[in-house]
Amino acid sequence: GIDFRDYPTSLELLSSAGAEVDGERVRFPRGMCREIITASAPAVYTHHGRNPARSVQVGGNATVFAPAYGSPFVHDLDEGRRYATIGDFHNFVKLAYQSPHMHLSGGTVCEPVDIPVHKRHLDMVYAHLRYSDKPFMGSVTATERAQDSVDLARIAFGDDFVEGNTVMTS
């Protein structure tokens, strides 16, 4: 099962939908999640980039390539294996942007430990917006970070466009 800590509303909602709730642990009957997703998610959608020519179809028979996600370490010829920095993050976003084989610039392409955690997500999303015009993934490590990602997307794409289109995934 999955523990949903400090979210009693979620527990009530999942229980009423047919999941087995035991305290904070939720167990989903076989097929329940697939049924919910199939009934509510589109089979195909467009993930928009700032450059419309780089927008990609997700779903159907489409294959979408994105960089690796979340590595705390990088490796270079001078220093070998080391913790990632925001400079490394910028370089990976630029590399993904330049690669004709990458459809997205990514999300957390590496974890820049030289930036304080409470503001790191802002620097990362900004890097995607500054160094690439491909679709990207926002930060979802906390509710407020997800909201910050949406707010930055609104600045880049405009409120009306964000309301009616997929400009970020995670």
Sequence positions of predicted segments:
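N-terminal alpha-helical targeting/anchoring segments
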Residues: 1-4
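Short, glycine/acidic-rich hinge or "gate" loops at secondary-structure transitions
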Residues: 6-10
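Catalytic alpha/beta active-site cores
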Residues: 11, 27-170
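Compact, charge-rich alpha-helical regulatory domains located at protein termini
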Residues: 18-20
